[in-house]
């Protein structure tokens, strides 16, 4: 597919307290039309700065930006992109934030309508005109239905929950029919249940409207829920980017692995083993194995195969299967018991089958 967002070799620098700070360094990111693209990193990684260059809320120092085939910034060959042209361009990019930024003295309906006060459309002769009052009202009514707030249109922000406030913000961000929706930590202020509801809404809007979503977050669980692609940022640089499935199946960078571990129940289980009395120390002919597998591998009886082929026995302590982008991913923690030669043959079989595994070793009980 064609990239709707192209950020090429972008750097962003600014002066802070007498010193030059590089917030983004030589970052390249291409986002295709229809992606839900997660950009993840810890606080200060540069993810918000990078993504705010998409609509030029943050002007880069170096590099090139192409949005929907139109070059809007090029440090090597400056582009004149200001005034009315810039305002019109920004209307096609909606944004939501961690803080909802609603007008407290206006109702839900009027908070959304406020974003339409300068909106224009083309008439049948190709001339631009402002929306009529009826057109604005119809648009707001349609959007409130879309975000499931039709029955709260007369309420004020103080009467809403956090999730409802964010739904108002989303409706407001959609008023000018944007092709791109940026969520800058849009779920960070919400509890887990409400977070999932907002993520479900974003996914639904993506499907209904065909909108491209850019999701900035410090939580891998948020990315895991709805994104199809991921970029990981650290110290202003994109250190890894790939499809969600490939990131989870074969993470390359230590930071990426750390983020993935925060979403994995198998890692919590492994950590708990050192504090449990369920397992004594392993025998000399036993090893504890953590095995990951995905897709068609889940259909194959791998554990059964190794017990038959290599004269080893197994004892499964943990098993889990979940779906990522509709593809199953599974984890097992099991003991492998047998002679060193037979255990080595079983592990070689894992390698042959392209299964990801690690030897966890013996369990040593620890005390808190």
Curated annotation (Swiss-Prot):
It is found in: Cell membrane. Belongs to the ABC transporter superfamily. Methionine importer (TC 3.A.1.24) family. SMART domains: AAA, NIL. It is an enzyme of class 7 (translocase). This is Methionine import ATP-binding protein MetN. ATP binds at residues 41-48. GO terms for cellular component: plasma membrane. CDD domains: ABC_MetN_methionine_transporter. It catalyses: L-methionine(out) + ATP + H2O = L-methionine(in) + ADP + phosphate + H(+); D-methionine(out) + ATP + H2O = D-methionine(in) + ADP + phosphate + H(+). Its EC number is 7.4.2.11. It comes from the Bacteria. It comes from Lactococcus lactis subsp. cremoris (strain SK11). Its main location: membrane. Part of the ABC transporter complex MetNIQ involved in methionine import. Responsible for energy coupling to the transport system. The complex is composed of two ATP-binding proteins (MetN), two transmembrane proteins (MetI) and a solute-binding protein (MetQ). The gene is metN.
């Amino acid at each position: 597919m064609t990239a709707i967002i192209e950020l090429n070799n972008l750097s962003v620098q600014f002066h802070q307290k007498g010193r030059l700070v590089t917030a983004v360094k030589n970052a390249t990111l291409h986002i295709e039309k229809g992606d839900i693209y997660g950009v993840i990193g810890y606080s200060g990684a540069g993810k918000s700065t990078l993504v705010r260059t998409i609509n030029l809320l943050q002007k880069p120092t170096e590099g090139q930006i192409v949005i929907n085939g139109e070059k809007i910034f090029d440090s090597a060959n400056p582009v004149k992109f200001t005034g009315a042209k810039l305002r019109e361009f920004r209307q096609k990019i909606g944004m939501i934030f961690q803080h909802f930024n609603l007008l407290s003295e206006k109702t839900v309906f009027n908070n959304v309508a406020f974003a339409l006060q300068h909106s224009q459309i083309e008439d049948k002769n190709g001339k631009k005109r402002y929306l009529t009052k009826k057109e604005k009202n119809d648009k707001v009514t349609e959007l409130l239905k879309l975000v499931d707030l039709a029955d709260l249109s007369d309420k004020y922000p103080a009467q809403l929950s956090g999730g409802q406030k964010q739904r108002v913000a989303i409706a407001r961000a959609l008023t000018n029919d944007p092709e791109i929706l940026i969520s800058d930590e849009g779920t960070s202020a919400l509890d887990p249940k409400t977070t999932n509801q907002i993520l479900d809404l974003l996914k639904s809007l993506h499907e209904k409207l065909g909108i491209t979503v850019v999701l900035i977050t410090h939580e891998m669980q948020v990315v895991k829920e709805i994104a199809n692609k991921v970029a990981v940022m650290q110290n202003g640089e994109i250190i890894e980017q790939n499809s969600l499935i490939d990131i989870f199946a074969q993470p390359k960078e230590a930071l990426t692995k750390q983020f993935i571990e925060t979403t994995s129940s198998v890692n919590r289980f492994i950590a708990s083993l050192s504090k449990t009395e369920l397992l004594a120390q392993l025998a000399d002919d036993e090893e504890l194995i953590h095995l990951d597998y995905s897709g068609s591998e889940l259909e194959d009886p791998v554990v059964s195969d190794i017990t038959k082929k290599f004269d080893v026995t197994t004892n499964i302590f943990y098993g889990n299967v979940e779906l990522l982008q509709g593809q199953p991913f599974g984890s097992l923690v099991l003991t492998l018991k047998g002679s060193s030669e037979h255990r080595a043959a079983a592990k070689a079989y894992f390698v042959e089958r392209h299964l990801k595994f690690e030897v966890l070793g013996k369990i040593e009980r620890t005390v808190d």
